[in-house]
Design a protein with these regions (language model features):
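Signature aromatic-anchored transmembrane alpha helix within multi-pass, membrane-resident enzymes
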Residues: 269-270, 374-400
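Transmembrane alpha-helical segments
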Residues: 129-137, 176, 188-200, 243-250, ...
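Transmembrane catalytic cores of multi-pass membrane glycosyltransferases
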Residues: 63, 219, 226-330, 334, ...
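Start-transfer (signal-anchor) and selected internal transmembrane alpha helices
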Residues: 1-52
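Extracytoplasmic
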Residues: 242, 399-529
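Short hydrophobic alpha-helices at membrane interfaces in multi-pass membrane enzymes
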Residues: 198-228
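Active-site lumenal/periplasmic loops and adjacent helix-entry segments of GT-C-fold
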Residues: 33-187, 210, 235, 407, ...
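Hydrophobic/aromatic-rich transmembrane helices and adjacent perimembrane loops
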Residues: 240, 347-385
Length: 529
C-alpha cells in the first residue's frame, strides 16, 4: 500500500510517523470477498447426498411401474404412444405430460429402459425441490437459517403413522416418491410461489419497467407459463399451486390499478394457453372425470395419526395471522383446508391429494418463527423445544428408517417398503405382449418393462371405465378355479394374451407351459396360446 509520512509533535520534538493510507479497490488484488456458503447450501447439499443414496438403495415400488410403463410407451413411439398399461390407443392419457415426454425422449436417445429413467429422475426432482424450497423461504424471510428449518419441518413434522402417497414428501416417502412427476411438480410449485410472491411485493431484480412503473409483461407471462407447466405435469398439484398464487397475490399485492390487473391477467391467460395447447391430452377435461375418486377415499382416513405433528406450527401461523389478516401463509392454509373439506363433503376425494401441501404453511411458518435471532422469549423457547421434540418423535416413529440402514438400526425403525423385481419375467416376455396377472405387485410392476396387461389396474381417461371394468371381470373369470379351458381360451384370444404371471396360490391352467419362476416370491411365468 502507498505510504505517507506525517509529523506528530511529542512535547517539543517532532517525530516522523509512518501512516498507511487505504486505497480504494486494493482488495481486488486478493480477489475480492471470499465466497462462503449459506447454511442452507451446506445442509441442502448434505440432504441431497443422503436422500439420493437412500432413494437409490430402496427398490422402486408402488406407482413407479406405471411411470416406467409411460416411459416405455413413449420410447416406442414419442408422438403417438399407446396406452400405458394395455394394448390400446393412448390418446387422451394425462400421463403423457411434458415431464413424461422429456423422459421418453431421453430414453430414446440414451437407450435406457423405463425403470432406469424413473430411477434417474429422483435426484433431478430432488434438486428442483431443494432449490424451490430455498427460493420460496427467502421470499418469506431473509433469516439465513429459515430454509434449513423449513426443510427439516417439511420432512419430519408429519405424524406417527406412515403417510405414503404420491405428492407426500416426508423423509420416508421420499425414498419411493422422488422419481414421480408429483415430486417435480411440487418443486416447481415452490418456485412459482416464490416468483409470484416476489412480484406481488415488488421485490427482486426486474430487467424492464414499463411506463406505469411496473415490471414488464414478459415476467408475468413467464410465471403463467410455469403454472401451466405444473398443471400439465401433475394437475392435482396444480390446484394447490393456484391456491398459493391466489394467497400470495391477495396477501401482498397492495394496489389494484388497471396495469396491475392486466399483468396478473396475462399470467393467468398464459397459464391457460400453455395448458390448452398441449397436444397429448385435454387437461381441462379432467375436472369432470371422477373415475379415480373412489381410490382416494383412503386419504381421509387416519388424518390425525398421519399429520398431527404438523399442528406444532399452529402457534406460529396464529402469530402471523395476528400480525396481518392477509398473511399469505394464513390464507394458503385456509384455502387448502376448505378444498380438502370440499373433497370430503362432495365425494371428490381426489382433492385429498393436496394434503401434503396443506401442511406447508404450518411447517414453514414454524421454521420462519424459529429462525429469529436470539435472545428468545419464553414463548419462542417453548415452541422451539416442542418442535425439536416433535421432530425426534417423527424421526423415531416413522421417518428415521428412510436414512438409517437396517444393519445400523439399533431400535428397529420402520423401514421403506421392499418390492420384488420382475426382471426375471421381463426377460421372457416381449415388449408389447399381453400378460394376464394376479396379486398386488406383479400387475403394478410388469408394465414398466414393456409388456401390457389384459386389464389395466388404474383408471385412465384414455380407456372408458366401463371397458376397464369389463376387462377386469374377464381376467377374474379367467383366474377362477371353476373356469373351463374353453372359457380361458376365449378370454386369452379376446385380449391377445400369451402369458400368465401368477402368484404361488393360483393354479396354473393345464394348457399353460411354465417358463420361469421366482425363488423370492414363488410366482410363476407361463406361456399360453
Amino acid at each position: 500500500m502507498p505510504q505517507t509520512y506525517s509529523t506528530s509533535p511529542i512535547g517539543k520534538a517532532a517525530v516522523d510517523t509512518l501512516v498507511r493510507r487505504a486505497v480504494r479497490g486494493a482488495t481486488a488484488l486478493c480477489g475480492g470477498r471470499v465466497w462462503r456458503p449459506t447454511p442452507y447450501q451446506v445442509f441442502g447439499f448434505l440432504f441431497f447426498l443422503v436422500i439420493s443414496l437412500a432413494y437409490w438403495a430402496v427398490p422402486l415400488c408402488c406407482d413407479a411401474g406405471q411411470h416406467a410403463a409411460v416411459v416405455e410407451r413413449l420410447k416406442a413411439n414419442l408422438l403417438h404412444p399407446r396406452h400405458p398399461m394395455a394394448d390400446l390407443p393412448g390418446a387422451g392419457s394425462p400421463y403423457y405430460s411434458p415431464y413424461a415426454v422429456s423422459q421418453g425422449a431421453f430414453a430414446r436417445l440414451s437407450g435406457l429402459g423405463g425403470w432406469e429413467v424413473v430411477r434417474l429422475a429422483g435426484p433431478l426432482n430432488l434438486l428442483v425441490l431443494l432449490t424451490g424450497i430455498g427460493r420460496f423461504v427467502r421470499v418469506l424471510t431473509p433469516r439465513p437459517w429459515a430454509p434449513v428449518l423449513a426443510l427439516g419441518a417439511m420432512t419430519l413434522l408429519w405424524g406417527t403413522e406412515r403417510a405414503w402417497w404420491s405428492g407426500y414428501l416426508s423423509l420416508m416417502s421420499m425414498t419411493g416418491n422422488l422419481g414421480y412427476p408429483s415430486a417435480c411438480a411440487i418443486g416447481l410449485t415452490f418456485w412459482a410461489w416464490a416468483l409470484t410472491g416476489a412480484r406481488a411485493r415488488r421485490e427482486g431484480l426486474v430487467r424492464y419497467v414499463g411506463p406505469s412503473g411496473l415490471p414488464g409483461l414478459a415476467g408475468y407471462a413467464g410465471i403463467g407459463a410455469l403454472y401451466g407447466l405444473i398443471l400439465l405435469v401433475h394437475p392435482i398439484t396444480a390446484v394447490a399451486a393456484v391456491l398459493g398464487a391466489v394467497a400470495f397475490v391477495a396477501g401482498w399485492q397492495r394496489e389494484w390499478r388497471s396495469p396491475v390487473v392486466l399483468r396478473w391477467g396475462v399470467a393467468a391467460g398464459t397459464a391457460a394457453l400453455a395448458a390448452w395447447s398441449w397436444p397429448y391430452f385435454d387437461v381441462f377435461a379432467l375436472a369432470a372425470d371422477d373415475s379415480v375418486d373412489w381410490m382416494h377415499r383412503r386419504l381421509y382416513e387416519q388424518l390425525f395419526g398421519q399429520f398431527w405433528l404438523a399442528l406444532l406450527g399452529l402457534p406460529a401461523l396464529w402469530l402471523r395471522w395476528r400480525n396481518s389478516r392477509r398473511d399469505p401463509l394464513v390464507l394458503l392454509f385456509a384455502l387448502d383446508c376448505l378444498l380438502v373439506a370440499f373433497g370430503w363433503v362432495s365425494g371428490h376425494y381426489t382433492y385429498g391429494r393436496i394434503l401434503g401441501l396443506t401442511l406447508v404453511p404450518l411447517q414453514f411458518a414454524l421454521a420462519v418463527e424459529l429462525a429469529a435471532p436470539r435472545p428468545w422469549g419464553r414463548a419462542r423457547r417453548a415452541l422451539g423445544g416442542a418442535a425439536a421434540a416433535g421432530a425426534c418423535v417423527g424421526f423415531l416413529t416413522v421417518q428415521g428408517g428412510a436414512v438409517v440402514p437396517r444393519v445400523l438400526d439399533p431400535v428397529g425403525l420402520e423401514q421403506p417398503s421392499l418390492w420384488p423385481s420382475y426382471a426375471w419375467a421381463a426377460r421372457h416376455v416381449g415388449k408389447g405382449e399381453v400378460v394376464i396377472s394376479d396379486g398386488h405387485f406383479a400387475p403394478r410392476s410388469i408394465p414398466g418393462y414393456g409388456p401390457n396387461l389384459a386389464a389395466p389396474i388404474w383408471p385412465d381417461p384414455a380407456l372408458d371405465e366401463r371397458e376397464r371394468e369389463r376387462r377386469l371381470a374377464d381376467v377374474h373369470a379367467y383366474l377362477s378355479p371353476t373356469s373351463t379351458r374353453a372359457e380361458r381360451t376365449a378370454v386369452a384370444r379376446r385380449y391377445h394374451a400369451h402369458w400368465l404371471l401368477l402368484t404361488r396360490w393360483k393354479r396354473v391352467p393345464e394348457e399353460a407351459v411354465i417358463v420361469a419362476w421366482s425363488p423370492e416370491t414363488g410366482e410363476v411365468l407361463a406361456r399360453i396360446g
